[in-house]
C-alpha cells in the first residue's frame, strides 16, 4: 500500500571536474532546445554508489522490497541480492532514471561579458533594467537544500538594487 511506500533520491554533483562535466542545453537549427548529458564512468560510479547506499538504508529500516532506478529491473527482497545485481548492472543512457533537483547555474556572474551573463550586482549584461536574482547566478549546483544561500545572495542583490532605484515622477 502507498502508506508503506518509500522513495529516496541520491544527488550526484557534477560540473566540478573534467571527468564529470555535467550536461549542456543547446539550440538546434530550428530553434528548439536539445539536452545532452554525458554518461561518464565517474557519473556511473556515483549512481551505483547512490543506489547501493539508498537500498542498504531501506533494507536496514525494514523494507521488504527495494527496486533499482534502472528500467526493467525486478524488485529485490534481500540486500545481498540487490548489491550483487547493482554491481553487475550496466548503467546506460535511457535505461537509468535521471532527474534534477535544486537546479542552479546557467547565468554566471562576472565582469567579463565573454564569460558571464550577469555582472556582480546580478544585472543582465545585454539588456538595461533587467536583474537576475535567483539560483541561476551560481556557477553550478551548490548541493542539497540551497535555500539559505539563495536567500542570502538575493537579499544582498535586492537591497543594493533598491538603494539605487530612484522614484519615478508622479504624473
Predicted regions and their residues:
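FAD-dependent oxidoreductase catalytic-site/capping-region signature
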Residues: 1-131, 136-138, 142-143, 149, ...
Amino acid at each position: 500500500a502507498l502508506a508503506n511506500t518509500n522513495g529516496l533520491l541520491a544527488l550526484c554533483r557534477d560540473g566540478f571536474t573534467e571527468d564529470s562535466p555535467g550536461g549542456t542545453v543547446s539550440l538546434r537549427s530550428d530553434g528548439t532546445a536539445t539536452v545532452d548529458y554525458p554518461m561518464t564512468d565517474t557519473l556511473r560510479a556515483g549512481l551505483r554508489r547512490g543506489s547501493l547506499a539508498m537500498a542498504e538504508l531501506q533494507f536496514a529500516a525494514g523494507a521488504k522490497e527495494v527496486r533499482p532506478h534502472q528500467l526493467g529491473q525486478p524488485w529485490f527482497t534481500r540486500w545481498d541480492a540487490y548489491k550483487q545485481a547493482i554491481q553487475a548492472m550496466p548503467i546506460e543512457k535511457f535505461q537509468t532514471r535521471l532527474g534534477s533537483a535544486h537546479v542552479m547555474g546557467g547565468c554566471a556572474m562576472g565582469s567579463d561579458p565573454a564569460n558571464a551573463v550577469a555582472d556582480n550586482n546580478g544585472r543582465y549584461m545585454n539588456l538595461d533594467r533587467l536583474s537576475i536574482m535567483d539560483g541561476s547566478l551560481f556557477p553550478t549546483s551548490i548541493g542539497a537544500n540551497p535555500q539559505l544561500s539563495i536567500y542570502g545572495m538575493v537579499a544582498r542583490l535586492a537591497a543594493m538594487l533598491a538603494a539605487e532605484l530612484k522614484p519615478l515622477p508622479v504624473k
